[in-house]
Amino acid sequence: MSNKMWGGRFTERPDEIMEDINVSIDVDRHLYAQDIAASKAHAAMLAAQGIITSGDAKNMARGLDTILSEITKGSFEFKRALEDIHMNVESRLSELIGPAAGRLHTARSRNDQVATDFRLFVRDEIDDIDAALAAYQQALATRALEFAGTVMPGFTHLQTAQPVTFGHHLLAYVEMAGRDRGRFADARERLNESPLGAAALAGTSFPIDRHATAQALGFDRPMANSLDAVSDRDFVLETLSAASICAVHLSRFAEEIVIWTSPLVGLIKLSDKFTTGSSIMPQKRNPDAAELVRAKTGRVIGALNGLLIVMKGLPLAYQKDMQEDKQGAMEAFAALSLAIRAMTGMALDLVPDEARMKAAAGEGYATATDLADWLVRTLKMPFREAHHVTGRIVALASKQGVALHELPLEAMQEVEPKITADVLGVLSVEASVKSRTSFGGTAPKNVASQAKAWLKRLEKQRK
């Protein structure tokens, strides 16, 4: 006869391989706080509804608090033979309060229990990630204000395109992080419904109060369909989708840090705090923190893809496949949280080489668009014609091996005789960025204003 809690109709013990593949405690032990909170809410509701006595409910609550303390202190013994976090907690509760512990599972299944636990866990992860992203935004916006007027090259195709400011570049990532936070908030809102009380799949005949347990656990409402409550994991998928997009944003900035710290580029420097050395080349300072952030993006995206594949062919309701929903997600959330903290640290640590940035901003004829705009504005030339004229002037400067602002006025007039000396006032990188005053543009005044607005917004969110 099986000694499992589900073993009443079984006459043989599970094979050892079955034990190994079925056990999940190594992963779902991380749900202990959520499992205990949900059990306390369930016990209180059962007592309020007259399904169990108030004395039993109080004993359950005291026992569950003891278990929480034991796990927190590291003295709790997790047993693989008990399969999962639910049975480990229930078994220990039986040791603490006796047979009354068996009444805790009244009107409840492990199906709605784990769905509730995991929703609570993901909700907690969202809140932690949001706080980390807010700190990341704070760091970026602070540095953006500091470097609102620091000119650097803006790139397209990784080629010098137009001058921008370093502060403007940093604010781009503040905006991305803001949208990331919005996606996590949206996922949290849809997540925040309680599966508890759905039981195995069809609900229960006991007169439970699902609204009471939902409220006790901070959910907005109970889920309206018991089949849906136990059989879907879209709340994890949606959160992993938000996490994947966020990780991609972090990875893009990390990639830029890797490029910019290269001696061949030299736009920024990281201190020893966020670099490592080589075991054989003593001169090396490697941007390993940024490289690892870039790599961890694959772990996050992989978790999303993995769970999508697990869920794609599952009929309703619960299937054991869904036991594989947690490990990848937990690892992904941990990886993302670490990546956010690492990027926050690097954002505060990095030091731009302002002279190198300014010099690089002028390379590659980056103010050519300013010349074309001058032709349109001053000579009333159609932009397409101005684009062509500017291209010829750039080709002439390239042939002579000089920067655009170094090309003699007479040489420009060979291409377009109407050009006057006034054009020289728009060809410096400083003039270029100062002229970009359109909303969202890179003009230093714009950047400072946007950075201050973000810092004010973040301060308001903290209150």
UniProtKB/Swiss-Prot annotation:
Its main location: cytoplasm. GO terms for cellular component: cytosol. It is an enzyme of class 4 (lyase). It is found in: Cytoplasm. Its EC number is 4.3.2.1. CDD domains: Argininosuccinate_lyase (cd01359). It holds the Pfam family Lyase_1. One of its GO terms (molecular function) is argininosuccinate lyase activity. SUPFAM superfamilies: L-aspartase-like. The keyword RNA-binding does not apply. Keywords: Amino-acid biosynthesis, Arginine biosynthesis, Cytoplasm, Lyase. Pathway: Amino-acid biosynthesis; L-arginine biosynthesis; L-arginine from L-ornithine and carbamoyl phosphate: step 3/3. It catalyses: 2-(N(omega)-L-arginino)succinate = fumarate + L-arginine. GO terms for biological process: arginine biosynthetic process via ornithine; L-arginine biosynthetic process. It comes from the Bacteria. PROSITE patterns: FUMARATE_LYASES. The keyword Cytoplasm applies. NCBIfam families: argH. Belongs to the lyase 1 family. Argininosuccinate lyase subfamily. This is Argininosuccinate lyase. It comes from Bradyrhizobium sp. (strain ORS 278).
